[in-house]
Amino acid sequence: NNSIIITADHGMQPKSKADGSPNAIYLQDILDKKFGDNSSKVILPITDPYVVHHGALGSFATIYLEDKSKINEAMEEIKKIKEIEIVVSNEAGCEEYDLPKDRMGDIICMSSQYMTIGSSESSHDLSKLKEPLRSHGGLHEREVPFISNKKINSFLSNEKLNNYDAFYYAIAGA
């Protein structure tokens, strides 16, 4: 009579060009060119260089700026990049995506479905990448399975399930 919930921490999307090469935007390089070296710091939550599939490239980045008066200008510059879908301030992004404000930079951005974001090209050694690039971290990788071996008669709210709800429903079903 045990409750079992099966879910995942995130989905995954292909992030390669038609020729198989990685599809990446190196945001630190772009910002350094526009605003100068050391004017910003692009932080990627996927930091392990696991070259089997993602090579520390993902769909999410947060950016800290030295000069806070340049936040709007930097956001406008990033919005010009075709494959960056989401560009928002810390406050707006943390509110919309339920992120901790004290752990996010001044700007939050996410790439399109088949694009990754890197810091600088020199920071990502993709020479050992033998398979087509695939990664996660953005809106297109949020959908994951949520499977229960028991019928769930009532949900916490009318909102959709999140993978972190698994523990609650496993216990509630026990």
Question: Where are the regions a protein language model picked out?
Answer:
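Feature captures the catalytic ectodomains and active-site-proximal regions of enzymes
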Residues: 1-174
